[in-house]
Structure formats: structure tokens, C-alpha cells
């Protein structure tokens, strides 16, 4: 069963590949899996920062992560965060 620790461990293992293939600078977990309040229906909220813009390839990354974890992924970038929740989310992210 997925939990915070094994998601973070897997992201850490994938990080070199994600850096090479998708120009990932930082990646981390937030949301219900991060604070152990997830359910069977919960998606995995992943925060990502890129070294450079990757355009539509962000959708390929999301699909790759969904296949890797076997669960819906909500992939979020700093620019996509609404101002009202940005600080709260950024404080919650557990980076690998």
C-alpha cells in the first residue's frame, strides 16, 4: 500500500531520471499523502520545479508518474499555485 515514505523513496530513486528526461530541479510531495490523511480515492499531489520550461512535456511527466504509482497524480508547479494557497502548499511540500 502506498504511503508517504514509499512515495518519497520512489521519487528519490526516480529523481536522476526525472532531472535528465524532464529537467526537474526539485520534486516533492504535498497534500493528503504528505500529512497521512489519504484515502483509497486520494490522488498523489506532487510539486515540481523545472530547470527550464518543458512545455507540453509536463503532461508526459504526469502520465509517467501515474503509471509509476498506479494512481492519479496532481502535478503542480509554483506558477500554477493560486496566491491564496501558495504559502500553505509551499510549507507543506516534502522534497526529495
Residue ranges of model-derived segments:
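Short, well-ordered beta-strand segments
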Residues: 28, 45-47
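Catalytic core of pol beta-like nucleotidyltransferases
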Residues: 1-26, 34-40, 50-96
Amino acid at each position: 500500500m502506498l504511503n508517504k515514505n514509499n512515495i518519497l523513496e520512489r521519487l528519490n530513486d526516480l529523481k536522476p531520471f526525472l532531472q535528465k528526461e524532464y529537467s526537474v530541479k526539485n520534486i516533492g510531495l504535498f497534500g493528503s499523502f504528505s500529512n497521512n490523511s489519504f484515502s483509497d480515492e486520494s490522488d498523489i499531489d506532487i510539486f515540481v520545479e523545472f530547470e527550464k520550461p518543458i512545455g507540453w512535456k509536463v503532461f508526459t511527466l504526469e502520465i509517467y508518474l501515474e503509471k509509476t504509482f498506479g494512481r492519479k497524480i496532481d502535478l503542480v508547479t509554483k506558477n500554477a499555485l493560486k496566491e491564496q494557497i501558495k504559502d500553505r502548499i509551499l510549507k507543506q511540500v516534502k522534497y526529495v
